[in-house]
Curated annotation (Swiss-Prot):
Gene: atpA
Protein name: A-type ATP synthase subunit A
High-level lineage: Archaea, Methanobacteriati, Methanobacteriota, Stenosarchaea group, Methanomicrobia
Domain of life: Archaea
Listed Gene3D superfamilies: 2.40.30.20, 2.40.50.100, Bovine Mitochondrial F1-atpase, Atp Synthase Beta Chain, Chain D, domain 3, P-loop containing nucleotide triphosphate hydrolases
InterPro entries linked to this entry: ATP-synt_VA_C (IPR055190), ATP-synth_a_Xtn (IPR031686), ATP_synth_asu-like_sf (IPR023366), ATP_synth_asu_arc (IPR005726), ATPase_a/bsu_AS (IPR020003), ATPase_F1/V1/A1_a/bsu_N (IPR004100), ATPase_F1/V1/A1_a/bsu_N_sf (IPR036121), ATPase_F1/V1/A1_a/bsu_nucl-bd (IPR000194)
Length: 579
């Protein structure tokens, strides 16, 4: 058996080679054009390969060459601001080489080999180090300091020598006593999770600036969430909002089998967006992986693993990373196609039996951890799921729900009513509520959890009353129940609805969320007192302060505005009761 074999059979993205000395998950070059592939099954002397490029024109008898290496990514300065495909080929570099259409078999290194980076060591000769220890820093962008680490698979040893200066990622910057050369970059296999010291309890929320998420269904840093929903319900816009505004320091956005137009929107928008915390371009802390639906299906799986490996790398530096995978359903469809080409026994709806194992393998790499340098870092994974026809009982959604702890259920009916984000507050849930309670009590207000519980109760009551309203109309209800419906409507329209394209309303701080909810509940309390003292419901509905309250979401100076609205509200209710 040699490092070179020949093609025996071609079936779409799956190629069978004979006479190849290969191990599982070795990367191979397939055919005369050297298409990149990965060994996924070995049967006696046959190696079954999934090819990450289009196999049109490949025929039996062509050579297959084994690289002897697993599918790996290059980790080092230059990742941020980059746009990659699923196997870490830099699309901008390939465009300069090839034009708008990339020909097959073309490759380019993930990190630039010519750009020089200013390296400042933080260790000296004679210092003891081991895998994951920071040896120096590079100012990668204006926002992010890149920490250069000893590769994680290096045991405990001593620094022999280390240099300061400007280097490319391939230049040797020092040596260890065990003979290891130190460079600004190292490679890591994408299927192997990077090691950490300890996993921490998820008790710090990831602040997203989206009221329905922060207010009702929060996610913790290092948590996992799923956004299932039918077409046109707002999955991609919700993911993009999270990528833009969540308080993670690094964002990895994976377009996994998404429409080309949606990826174009991201690629066109992100470079012009400003990071609200630093005032620098948002791209300075973002890695984009674009793998559109017309690209070969096998690369979809690779794009998810590539993305999470890059996320873990920045986590190891002590950063909070949020990873958006849009959409994991397309990855599952690719798995189904390759599984059928391999003639494996199909599971439910034709998906392979190992669907749940692959999904959990991916989501379980999320977490808030202590890194080898003793710092806290986190990877928060938010995966969109696109069930056919919006049917969330299908296998991908169900298997995802068993793994993730936050479920943001997008609703087509809400989207049709132009209620965005169209997250159904009755179907969604967050299992991080209890672990985050203390954080909200200490850092926001002891009232936060109480207000949230009251608003959820009102929304539940409204749902029950709506069934009666549809039969007999709202006028047939007692006035206190009419008021319940009205306050719930205010919560829905003022608090839960949010305009992603409005410069003020696109992001809402926790302080503003608290004050908005407080004012709505205060209106409800005044209204109940007024009803009890005989004020008719029609007069309460016509108050000016109620209409003014609806405008607060578009006010940048919300504090002064809400103070005025609350004062007006108090006066109006007093004059109603006096009359």
């Amino acid at each position: 058996m040699s490092q070179q074999g020949t093609i025996y059979r071609v079936a779409g993205p799956v190629v069978t080679a004979v006479g190849l000395n290969a191990r599982m998950y070795d990367v191979v070059k397939v055919g005369n054009e050297g298409l990149m592939g990965e060994v996924i099954e070995i049967d006696n002397d046959k190696a079954i390969i999934q090819v990450y490029e289009d196999t049109s024109g490949v025929r039996p008898g062509e050579p297959v060459e084994n690289t002897g290496m697993p599918l790996s990514v290059e980790l080092g300065p230059g990742l941020l601001t980059s746009i990659y495909d699923g196997i870490q080929r830099p699309l901008e570099v390939l465009k300069e080489k090839m034009g708008n259409f990339i020909t097959r078999g073309v490759s380019a290194p993930g990190l630039s080999r010519t750009k020089k980076w200013k390296f400042v060591p933080v260790v000296k000769a004679g210092d003891k180090v081991k895998g994951g220890i920071v040896i120096g820093t590079v100012q990668e962008t204006k926002t992010i300091v890149h920490k250069i680490m000893v590769p994680p698979n290096v045991g405990e040893t001593t620094i022999k020598d280390i240099k300061e200066g400007e280097f490319t990622v391939e230049d040797v910057i020092g040596h260890l006593e065990n003979g290891t050369e130190l460079k600004l970059m190292h490679k890591w296999p994408v299927r192997v999770p990077r090691p950490y010291v300890e996993k921490l309890r998820p008790d710090i929320p990831l602040i997203t600036g989206q009221r329905v998420l922060d207010g009702l269904f929060p996610i913790a840093k290092g948590g996992t969430a799923a956004i299932p929903g039918p077409f046109g319900s707002g999955k991609t816009v919700t993911q993009q909002q999270l990528a833009k505004w969540s308080d993670a320091e690094i964002v990895v956005y994976i377009g996994c089998g998404e429409r080309g137009n949606e990826m174009t929107e991201v690629l066109a928008e992100f470079p012009h967006l400003t990071d609200p915390k630093t005032g620098n371009p948002l791209m300075d802390r973002t890695v984009l992986i674009a793998n559109t639906s017309n690209m070969p299906v096998a690369a979809r799986e690779a794009s998810c693993y590539t993305g999470i490996t890059i996320a873990e790398y920045y986590r190891d530096m002590g950063y909070g990373v949020s990873l958006m995978a849009d959409s994991t359903s397309r990855w599952a469809e690719a798995m189904r196609e390759i599984s059928s080409r391999l003639e494996e026994m199909p599971g439910e709806e034709g998906y392979p039996a190992y669907l749940a194992a692959r999904l959990s393998e991916f989501y379980e790499r999320a977490g808030r951890v202590i890194t080898p340098i003793g710092k806290e870092g986190s990877v928060t994974v938010i995966g969109a799921v696109s069930p056919a026809g919006g049917d969330i009982s299908e296998p991908v959604t169900q298997n995802t729900l068993r793994i993730v702890k936050v479920f943001w259920a997008l609703d087509a009916k809400l989207a049709q009513r132009r209620h965005f984000p169209s997250i159904n507050w009755l179907n969604s849930y967050s299992l991080y509520q209890d672990s985050l309670k203390d954080w909200y009590d200490k850092n926001i207000s002891p009232e936060w959890n109480q207000l949230k519980a009251e608003s959820m109760e009102l929304l539940q009551r409204e749902s029950e009353l709506q069934e009666i309203v549809q039969l007999v109309g709202s006028d047939a209800l007692p006035e206190d129940q009419q008021l319940t419906i009205e306050i719930a409507r205010m919560i829905r329209e003022i608090f839960l609805q949010q305009n992603a394209y409005h410069e003020v309303d696109t992001y809402c701080s926790l302080d503003k969320q608290l004050k908005m909810l407080k004012s709505i509940m205060q209106f409800g309390a005044y209204a109940r007192t007024a009803l009890a003292s005989g004020v008719p419901m029609s007069k309460i509905l016509n108050l000016n302060s109620k209409n003014d309250l609806a405008k607060v979401k578009f006010e940048a100076n919300y504090d002064a505005y809400l103070t005025k609205v609350n004062d007006d509200m108090k006066k109006e209710f007093k004059s109603l009761e006096a009359a």
